[in-house]
Regions:
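N-terminal Rossmann-like dinucleotide-binding module
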Residues: 15-54
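Internal anion-binding site segments
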Residues: 208-258
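Amphipathic, non-transmembrane alpha-helical secondary structure
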Residues: 28, 32-36, 86-90, 108, ...
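N-terminal glycine-/serine-/threonine-rich beta1-alpha1-beta2 phosphate-ribose binding loop
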Residues: 47, 51-95
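Short, low-complexity intrinsically disordered segments enriched in A/P/G/S/L with frequent Arg
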Residues: 2-5, 10-13
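Internal alpha/beta domain cores that form substrate/cofactor-binding pockets in large enzymes
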Residues: 17, 42-43, 73-92, 105-123
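Donor/substrate-binding cores of folate-linked one-carbon enzymes
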Residues: 37, 47, 96-213
Length: 258
């Protein structure tokens, strides 16, 4: 029998067998919180190491570094739709899979494997800003508030039933890295609360008519439109950090505006 842990409110809850799937620094607080809450993280899945920076040296994802420091088994498959990947994922016998900015859409076999489903921590107030870059686009579009959503993952991207949400204001001069740092810790707390209350939560369906989208960023997004208002340009400077950044001319390679 699993030993109970205590939530911040003092309520005991049973630990779970969890597969964690995430990649960037913003996913680390959620994994850290799962360990602090006493859950059994049976595997950590993340993206493969990639070349970056000067000299294109290979860099590992932040989640991989954290997981290895804590003795957790790490998987970095280049493809997840193979029979081998599906069989490995199912073999864990997980209660839940937790996904935080993993960077890939899970196949149906993955969604069916955990006993209690796959839970996503998404950095917006769904159904607003579905997609890969919600914090960036919230700032660029001049939103004054955003938040974090926990949800069950379904077949459609970021459209699954909502479990819990937490709203926060966006600072007038806040950049995307600053906002994401806050949201990552809000997300960790919300994930902890979600798992502790999972037996008592009623998932709420999203309404497609209310959905807005946060598409994947490209370098072209950072090109400043000098016909825009000063306020719009200022939001782009804050919102397109740390990439693609705001730059003044299509041929700009070194001049970056922060």
């Amino acid at each position: 029998k699993a030993e109970p842990y205590r939530t911040e409110g003092g309520k005991a809850a049973n630990t779970m067998r969890i597969v964690f799937m995430g990649t960037p620094e913003s996913a680390v607080p959620s994994l850290q919180r799962l360990l602090a809450d006493g859950h059994e993280v049976v595997a950590v899945w993340t993206q493969p190491d990639k070349p970056a920076g000067r000299g294109d040296k290979m860099h590992s994802p932040a989640i991989k570094d954290f997981a290895l420091q804590h003795g957790l088994p790490v998987e970095q498959p280049r493809k997840i739709k193979t029979d081998e990947a599906k069989e490995l994922f199912a073999s864990y016998g997980a209660d839940v899979a937790v996904v935080v900015a993993y960077g890939r859409i899970l196949p149906a076999e993955f969604l069916r494997a955990p006993r209690r489903g796959c839970i996503n921590v998404h950095f917006s107030l769904l159904p607003q800003y579905r997609g890969a870059a919600p914090a960036n686009w919230a700032i660029v579009n001049g939103e004054t508030r955003t938040g974090v959503t926990t949800m069950f993952i379904g077949a459609e991207l970021d459209a699954g039933p909502i479990l819990l949400q937490h709203e926060t204001m966006i600072g007038e001069i806040e950049t995307t890295p600053e906002l994401m740092q806050r949201l990552s810790f809000i997300g960790a707390d919300l994930l902890s609360e979600t798992l502790a209350q999972l037996d008592h939560l009623t998932p709420r369906p999203q309404h497609a008519r209310d959905a807005t989208f946060a598409p994947l960023l490209t370098r072209q997004h950072g090109l400043i439109n000098w016909l825009s208002t000063a306020a719009t340009i200022e939001r782009c400077v804050r919102g397109f950090q740390p990439w693609p950044t705001a730059y003044p001319h299509p041929n700009s390679r070194r001049l970056i505006i922060w």
